[in-house]
Structure formats: C-alpha cells, structure tokens
C-alpha cells in the first residue's frame, strides 16, 4: 500500500506520554486517537486500499466490522479512565468543546471522554460511506 505524499498518518499523539493503555484483552497501546487528523488520514488510506483490492474480485462487500466496541477504560492500577484521557489532543478537544452547550458528539464536537467512542464510530462510518459511494 502506497501512502499519499505529504500526508501525516501517525496514530499517536506526538505529545502522548502514557502508552500502557490496556484493552479488555490486555494488549497495550492499541487505541486509535480520534482527536487528531492523522488518524482519519490513515483510515481513509486503509479503506481506499481495501476497496481497490476487493474491486478486483467482483466488488467490495458493503459490510465492514469497525471494532472498537471493546475499548477499555481500566488502567493496570485498576483506576477507571478512558484511554483518550491519556492523549493530549483529546484532552484539548474536550476542554475546547465542553463549555458550549450546543456541542455534542453527533455534531462532531464531543464534550466528554465517554462520547469519543461514539464520535469515532460516527465519523468513521461517514468516511466509509463517502469512500464507498465514490467508487
């Protein structure tokens, strides 16, 4: 898969310092950051590539399992914490959005960490739909 020129596809916040964020399966560091544009660039590239591969075999399946429903919110110390609370870009996004009562995850402006999973899923579904409809 060839990455597009001059596009950032980092999945990590460059200012992130905590990496021992376990999943419910106890894998570390497997959570995408929905608060930075590079995550969305990466996902667009992956979906476009999947689409092009499947097109060679009589069409792309219109069902994609997004996963993510098991994003954990427990640290190894047992403290409940959403993984995105460790991402400086998400902390900044929530801080910027939470003081405006008109903001909400479904408008693309989540105001709480527990809304980021819904925000991620909704935005990813829109990207998938646009990419699938464009082929």
Label for each model-derived stretch:
Residues 130-135:
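Short, compositionally biased segments
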């Amino acid at each position: 898969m060839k990455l597009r020129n001059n596009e950032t596809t980092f999945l990590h916040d460059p200012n992130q310092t905590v990496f021992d964020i376990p999943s419910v399966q106890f894998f570390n560091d497997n959570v995408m950051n929905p608060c930075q544009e590079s995550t969305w660039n990466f996902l667009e590239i992956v979906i476009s590539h999947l689409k092009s591969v499947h097109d060679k075999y009589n069409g792309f399946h219109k069902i994609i399992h997004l996963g993510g429903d098991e994003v954990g919110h427990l640290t190894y110390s047992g403290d409940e914490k959403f993984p995105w609370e460790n991402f400086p870009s998400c902390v900044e996004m929530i801080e910027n959005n939470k003081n405006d009562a008109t903001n909400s995850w479904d408008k693309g402006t989540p105001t709480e960490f527990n809304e980021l999973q819904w925000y991620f899923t909704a935005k990813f579904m829109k990207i998938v739909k646009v990419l699938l409809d464009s082929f």
